[in-house]
Amino acid sequence: MKTIDLNCDLGEGFGAWEMGNDAAMIELASSVNVACGFHAGDPDIMRRTVELAKARGVSVGAHPGYRDLHGFGRHPIAGLKASEIENLVAYQIGALQAIATAAGHKVTHVKAHGALSNVACEDDMTAKAIAAGIKAVDPSLIFVVLANSKLVKAGEAANLPMVHEVFADRAYEDDGNLVSRKKPGAVLHDAKAIADRVVRMVQDGAVVSVTGKVIKMRTDTVCIHGDTHGAVEIARTLRQALKDAGIEVAPFKRGA
């Protein structure tokens, strides 16, 4: 039986402000990526999210981003040196590791957020700096990378365990990168269409771009954004579609 991990970005509120329905999404995901305070999240939200994950038996990963609360980590920050990127990644991983330890859970993976990830997918220096930050903290942490991107090469060079990610609710360009959120149609919302699309991704090991180009991609984990409108319905519909197709949802493992 084929298996696939469903990952979701959670803990992305701040103070009294909430983003998405974390309690519902965590029931449908097999792994979660927790905001670590730079683009969203704070110590209390991080703790609650980790405790929810522990209670549900869901693996937890750090979701580091640029220091950009105002822009939710979706604004690229130019001019950062490799050492600065490495340090901001290491800092955020360490913060979540401390919270996870306090909650009796463990951080298993790292997935870069928003603009940090988008820049790294096309920029060698940023990709290598993220990988270096992970390796410096714990070389056994799994690096979640956008399939076919520069993050893959950076992870390989750093000898990090990796899982390759595709996105359920995002459109793809012909080069395999995600369509910018600034463009119409970048974020998908039709639950049935998304579910059918993901089943094909898992079965075929490929995604279809906005122009209809078929791009072969290793598919270890599928991301559903918790802040996407209708995220809970999308996740429920997707899980049922995977079950109907004989595909088991299960957390990814080291060396997947």
From Swiss-Prot:
InterPro entries: Glyco_hydro/deAcase_b/a-brl, LamB/YcsF/PxpA-like. Gene3D superfamilies: Glycoside hydrolase/deacetylase (3.20.20.370). Keywords: ATP-binding, Hydrolase, Nucleotide-binding. GO terms for molecular function: 5-oxoprolinase (ATP-hydrolyzing) activity; ATP binding. Its EC number is 3.5.2.9. The keyword Hydrolase applies. It holds the Pfam family LamB_YcsF. GO terms for biological process: carbohydrate metabolic process. Disulfide bonds: none annotated. Catalyzes the cleavage of 5-oxoproline to form L-glutamate coupled to the hydrolysis of ATP to ADP and inorganic phosphate. Belongs to the LamB/PxpA family. This is 5-oxoprolinase subunit A 2. It comes from Bradyrhizobium diazoefficiens (strain JCM 10833 / BCRC 13528 / IAM 13628 / NBRC 14792 / USDA 110). The gene is pxpA2.
